[in-house]
């Protein structure tokens, strides 16, 4: 199982939110590229980067900061937040990003998402509140169930699906293992769990399922609850 340290960007700074609320943003670093270097030193292979401003605005607000992060390390980087057209996908991949995360557009235009997955390295991000998909920076909840959306991308070339339980995100209250398993089993895709990781036990619980491909870690590290170096050693 892969651990993905997370860097969420707001106005060029690394922040964490609680339940996806922008007004809850807490700044952890004004030099996100230095954070990326630290994660690489700890043993990370992948980095999960989200342009929060982009998620709300629908455009690449923190592109320059992401460029700096990509150039600072040899980490593989997956990027999400406001990526809703082919031009932006190509722009990020040309920059050196390993793969892009499509979120809102996956719900609004699954045909486009499937087409892009057939051409480029695409991950689908499914963010859910009480089991239903949320979009537009989590500000809008649809009437589509997360498991039903995941099924749509089972055989179209999507590399993985990231499933986030919004109610858990940034709350340090434990990860929703059952939700992650529902997505993994319904889609048959590599599934990356996100939201609520509080310590090493949450990571080990996901690993123990043998059905979850990865986990995204943010606030648990930033708040000193998780020794990432040790986590990489334990997960292997």
Swiss-Prot record:
Q: Which InterPro entries match?
A: Aldolase_TIM, His_biosynth, HisA_bact_arch, Isoase_HisA-like, Isoase_HisA-like_bact, RibuloseP-bd_barrel
State a single Gene Ontology molecular function: 1-(5-phosphoribosyl)-5-[(5-phosphoribosylamino)methylideneamino]imidazole-4-carboxamide isomerase activity
* Keyword Acyltransferase listed: no
Where does the UniProt annotation locate this protein? Cytoplasm
Which reaction equation describes what this protein catalyses? Answer: 1-(5-phospho-beta-D-ribosyl)-5-[(5-phospho-beta-D-ribosylamino)methylideneamino]imidazole-4-carboxamide = 5-[(5-phospho-1-deoxy-D-ribulos-1-ylimino)methylamino]-1-(5-phospho-beta-D-ribosyl)imidazole-4-carboxamide
Q: Which GO terms describe its biological process?
A: L-histidine biosynthetic process; L-tryptophan biosynthetic process
- EC no. given is 5.3.1.16
Primary location recorded for the protein, binned into one broad class:
cytoplasm
Read off the CDD domains from this record: HisA (cd04732)
| Taxonomic superkingdom | Bacteria
Part of which pathway?
Amino-acid biosynthesis; L-histidine biosynthesis; L-histidine from 5-phospho-alpha-D-ribose 1-diphosphate: step 4/9
Which leading EC class covers this enzyme? isomerase
* Family, per entry: Belongs to the HisA/HisF family.
Cross-referenced NCBIfam families, in alphabetical order?
Answer: 1-(5-phosphoribosyl)-5-[(5-phosphoribosylamino)methylideneamino]imidazole-4-carboxamide isomerase
Name-wise, this protein is 1-(5-phosphoribosyl)-5-[(5-phosphoribosylamino)methylideneamino] imidazole-4-carboxamide isomerase
Native organism is: Campylobacter concisus (strain 13826)
Could you read off the lineage of the organism from its UniProt record? Bacteria, Pseudomonadati, Campylobacterota, Epsilonproteobacteria, Campylobacterales
């Amino acid at each position: 199982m892969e651990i993905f340290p997370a860097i969420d960007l707001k106005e060029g700074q690394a922040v964490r939110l609680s339940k996806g609320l922008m007004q809850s943003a807490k700044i952890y670093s004004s030099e996100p590229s230095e954070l990326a270097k630290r994660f690489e030193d700890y043993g990370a292979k992948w980095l999960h980067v989200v342009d929060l401003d982009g998620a709300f605005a629908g455009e690449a607000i923190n592109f320059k900061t992401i460029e700096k992060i990509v150039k600072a390390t040899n980490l593989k980087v997956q990027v999400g937040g406001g990526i809703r057209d082919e031009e932006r996908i190509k722009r990020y991949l040309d920059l050196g990003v390993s793969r892009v995360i499509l979120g809102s557009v996956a719900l609004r235009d699954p045909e486009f998402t499937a087409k892009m997955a057939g051409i480029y390295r695409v991950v689908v991000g499914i963010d859910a509140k009480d089991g239903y998909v949320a979009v537009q920076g989590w500000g809008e909840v649809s009437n589509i169930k997360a498991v039903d959306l995941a099924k749509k991308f089972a055989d179209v070339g999507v590399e993985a699906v990231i499933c986030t339980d919004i109610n858990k995100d940034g709350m340090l209250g434990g990860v929703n293992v059952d939700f992650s398993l529902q997505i993994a089993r319904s889609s048959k895709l590599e599934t990356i769990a996100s939201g609520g990781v509080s310590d090493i036990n949450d990571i080990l619980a996901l690993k123990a399922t043998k059905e979850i491909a990865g986990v995204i870690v943010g606030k648990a590290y930033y708040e000193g609850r998780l020794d990432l170096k040790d986590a990489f050693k334990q997960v292997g």
